[in-house]
Amino acid sequence: MYIALRMSRDKVAIPTITSEIRYLGSFFQWMQAEEIIHQNPMLKIEKIKEPKVRKEALTDIEVEKLRAVVCDERERAILETLLSTGCRVSELVQITKTDIEGERVLIHGKGQKDRFVYLNAKAMLAIEKYLEKRKDKNQYLFPGSTAIIKSTSHLSPKDKHEWWTMPEHVKSDGHIEKGTIEDIMRRLAVRAGVKKANPHKLRRTCATMALRRGMPIEQVSKMLGHEELTTTQIYLDLSEDELAQAHKKYVI
């Protein structure tokens, strides 16, 4: 009755209901362990199946719109690296300059599992031009800023945007924050008129583009750093139109 009321009367989303069921189950389990109750009533509650929501990747046009409004070399390097490698934002911020070996990049993944990913020509050129303007000695590909940069009133409009070219405003050590990357992508999406272009959507876009161009799903899974192939299959869920086109191409 409680769950039905939460869904019908309170219009609570299914993920919230699922969490509440889990919390209540833990609470009654504790009560049972303390012998306050004899049986956990939540054991009879069936799990609610969440409807599968398809998460879209960016279209080719949306990707080009993002590229068209990039403001500087750092923004372009961030955008192209995410699109080319499909790495997580937590992995992007950890990349050092020595992790890059030509087109190959060493990624420090989840659970201390390293892997190599690869840069396409656009990403390699973007990183090269970006590093040419860097004059600091910070080891990270995308370093963090010093506290002084928070006050930019003394800088020219150009310098306010390209503070990272001035060593005095770059941390001697330490990488850019994940939140900063997300903010950069959020502003880029607004300028481009693209709905949502966060780092995770770029990761999905990289994977989806690779699959559409014929990259085997096992290789895509390895590129993304997935332990299970089923995780990659969720990322690469095809639309009905894409499935229909694939059927025409591959099924006689």
What are the residue ranges of the model-derived segments?
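Basic, Lys/Arg- and aromatic-enriched nucleic-acid-binding interface segment
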Residues: 37, 51-53, 60-89, 113
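C-terminal catalytic core of tyrosine-transesterase DNA break-rejoin enzymes
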Residues: 80, 84, 187, 203-227
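Active-site/catalytic core of tyrosine-dependent DNA strand-transfer enzymes
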Residues: 120-194
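N-terminal core-binding DNA-recognition domain of tyrosine recombinases/integrases
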Residues: 1-54
